Amino acid sequence: MEKVKIFISYHDEHYRIKSNILTPIQTGCANAPRLFKGMQHDNEGENISDRNDKYCELSAQYWVWKNYNKVGNPEYVGFMHYRRHFMFDGWQGNPDWCWLPKGNVYFVTNITSGYLSHISDEHIKQQLENCDCIVLKPYNVRHLHSKNIRMQYSKLPEQDVHIFDVFIKTAKSLYPEYRDDITKIEKGSVQYLSLIHI
């Protein structure tokens, strides 16, 4: 059994990162004009690939969940994105590449062998020896001049705040025992971005 598998979601042809641990997976294959060679496809086995336009890289996460036995039943499962990677050796990136103010999230325009050394299998294994879970540092939306998560969501041109409100109302209705926690998140200013985690 592999100790860890980290799936990297792709929906376009980009530099493919692949190792014993890092596994590329194409998302939205059910509606894609073509399948990329040399990677897992999210339309095999039980899947929601045909709904990728609504769920984005969650179609990869669903695929891994429902097809866990096909990926070797690893102790740890993780997810990254072709444009969003953890740096497993503590590298902080170039401040000129900063994507979010005070967020420690950077744009990298060119993936080189030097860059890849930060996400090597050895660094991944070492990092996981010391923790049970890895997520991005929480990001405070006040750095983007928003009072809370709902306000930040309402500022995004591709989003509809009505959907956010329906989600909150539905979650509180279905899970009343979490009502206070849901309200705290909704009215709070801290969020975890990018759908990357292990």
What are these regions (language model features)?
Residues 1-196:
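ER/Golgi luminal nucleotide-sugar-dependent glycosyltransferases, focusing on the catalytic module
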